[in-house]
From Swiss-Prot:
This is Large ribosomal subunit protein bL17. Keywords: Ribonucleoprotein, Ribosomal protein. It comes from the Bacteria. One of its GO terms (molecular function) is structural constituent of ribosome. Belongs to the bacterial ribosomal protein bL17 family. SUPFAM superfamilies: Prokaryotic ribosomal protein L17. It comes from Magnetococcus marinus (strain ATCC BAA-1437 / JCM 17883 / MC-1).
């Protein structure tokens, strides 16, 4: 029985699932909006919220933790600690939103956009 087991396996082993979440996290912060399946978006959301909170903290230890989580991508970490932290400074959580969009052709998987609530206007045009 799997009563009270948190999280979704997403048909992957642990290391593959963690790598996928980290890569999706980097893409989310880089593009500020990505399209993925609904279960993946629901798994990504709490991780993204925690990393944005690290960005708002702004100290050296938080920067090193974020660098570790974001696969060492210094460009994304810089954006997180400058742009995203500044945009979300007055928001107490709820930095992301999930918008259900369609069903994917081929396997009929439910798709959704996961995006940052305080998105940049220029990234919306992309």
């Amino acid at each position: 029985m799997r009563h009270k087991k948190r999280g979704r396996r997403l048909s992957r082993d642990t290391s593959h699932r963690q790598a996928m979440i980290k890569n999706m996290l980097v893409s989310l912060f880089k593009h500020e909006r990505i399209e993925t399946t609904v279960p993946r978006a629901k798994e990504l959301r709490p991780v993204a919220e925690k990393v944005i909170t690290l960005g708002k903290r702004g100290d050296l230890h938080a920067r090193r933790q974020a660098l570790s989580i974001l696969n060492g991508d210094k460009e994304v970490v810089h954006k997180l600690f400058t742009d995203l932290a500044e945009r979300n400074k007055d928001r107490q959580g709820g930095y992301t939103r999930i918008l259900k969009t369609r069903f994917r052709y081929g396997d009929c998987a439910p798709m959704s956009f996961i995006e940052l609530v305080e998105r940049d206007a220029t990234s919306a045009a992309e």
